Amino acid sequence: MSRPAYSEPEPFADIHIHFNWDQKEVTSASEVVARLRAHNAVLVQVSSTPPRLALELADAAGPWVLPYFSPYLTERHRTTWAVDDNVVAEAAKGLASGRYKGIGELHVFPDNGLRRENKVFNGLLQLAARYQVPFLIHTEASSHLFFAPVCQKYSQVRFLWAHAGNRLQPDAIDQLMQQCPNLWTEVSARDPWRYGKLTDSDNLLLPGWRELFIKYQDRFMTGTDPVWGNSEDNRYANADEAWDHYTQLIEWHRNWLKQLPPEVEEKIRLTNARKFISGN
């Protein structure tokens, strides 16, 4: 009996992955590349802590993996980057080398007292403008109004908004995208195991999302954001086995994407990322 022909999945632009120190402990760069290739991820953006690991993954893969410069120079910098002037200097060196293709992911939490006027934050934004590279930003705010003044002040910067504001609903996302034409939005980590609020228990898009994706079909992208167990208090005390869950994450994205009109699905799955990276 002949076996059914293998059908390769559609090419996928995974615009939000990580290869961090606590992931490298259990998954090598070559293993990450193999998993990406197995799922036909043809264009990938990676940020790493420390930043050099993004270069390591890009070297293992080739030009289809684009390394971003992470402001987290060590595993401790996620909570201290905003008070370390060396972050801007190191980012400037990284971008001047030509090897890093963007800045981020940068977590901006107003609840932690970070003000929009913060010197390090603005220094990084100025670098993005100077080198004309994208800025991957993760905001943790109850309203889109926190981020609006930033993307308006730096109108020359191409922002990629991680997780569509995490828990914000389509109406708030719509308002921000109207206010900031330089803002692109991605919905990584909106899966049921982390932020959620994109699909219901049957994996169907929740009200408002389909309409939002169609309205801004040229400015949405997606990615898997393979980080696992990050809601646990002791998250950084253990190795991160997220890459063992990559199939689960990417298949979930492929499923909800199929609920969109074919031309919109292809844009969000692939072609928007290509245009975003090229600056078009």
Go through the PLM ranges and name each one.
Residues 7, 51-136, 189-192, 198-199:
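Active-site gating/metal-coordination segments in enzymes
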Residues 13-17, 44-46, 65-71, 102-105, ...:
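Hydrophobic faces of well-ordered beta-strands that scaffold small-molecule active sites
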Residues 55-59, 80, 91-92, 114-118, ...:
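Distinct, well-ordered alpha-helical segments
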Residues 158, 166-280:
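H/E-rich (His + Asp/Glu) clusters that bind or coordinate divalent metals
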Residues 17-28, 75-82, 111, 194-198, ...:
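Acidic/histidine-rich helix-loop elements
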Residues 99, 123, 130-134, 153-158, ...:
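Glycine-enriched alpha-helix->loop->beta-strand junction motifs that scaffold or abut catalytic
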Residues 20-22, 51-54, 74-76, 109-112, ...:
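Active-site environment of divalent metal-dependent phosphoester hydrolases
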Residues 1-63:
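An N-terminally biased module of ancient metal coordination in phosphate/nucleic-acid-related enzymes
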